[in-house]
Amino acid sequence: MTVHNLYLFDRNGVCLHYSEWHRKKQAGIPKEEEYKLMYGMLFSIRSFVSKMSPLDMKDGFLAFQTSRYKLHYYETPTGIKVVMNTDLGVGPIRDVLHHIYSALYVELVVKNPLCPLGQTVQSELFRSRLDSYVRSLPFFSARAG
């Protein structure tokens, strides 16, 4: 099992942070364009799920998968979106995404007066702690294959 990449978006679609670990194929477009496409897809899926679901969707959509990867999604009440792409063998990771938001982003970025909100995260401490946390996950594989 493995982690491919992670996106962190604000409520307006600004990509606050992007990391990758075992991404085998690049999108072939500039990163800014990739971020816009990802956010647009998330917006569309979220809207579709909320309108088409036969049941009340308390948590909205949590994940979707293709034949090659699984996208995990977590949205906070303030509209911050945490997205992690993994391989298909990874089960639900809502608690992992919540931890990334609450213990890393909120503690190291939001509560840091030197980190302006609504802009790309420049904190090296956030980046290194995020990297360490993701690498410590039981489904993170040093040998993605």
From Swiss-Prot:
One of its GO terms (biological process) is vesicle tethering. It is found in: Golgi apparatus, cis-Golgi network; Endoplasmic reticulum. It comes from the Eukaryota. InterPro entries: Longin-like_dom_sf, TRAPPC. SMART domains: Sybindin. One of its GO terms (cellular component) is TRAPPIII protein complex. Keywords: Endoplasmic reticulum, ER-Golgi transport, Golgi apparatus, Transport. Pfam families: Sybindin (PF04099). Its main location: Golgi. The keyword Endoplasmic reticulum applies. May play a role in vesicular transport from endoplasmic reticulum to Golgi. This is Trafficking protein particle complex subunit 1. It comes from Homo sapiens (Human). The lineage of its organism: Eukaryota, Metazoa, Chordata, Craniata, Vertebrata.
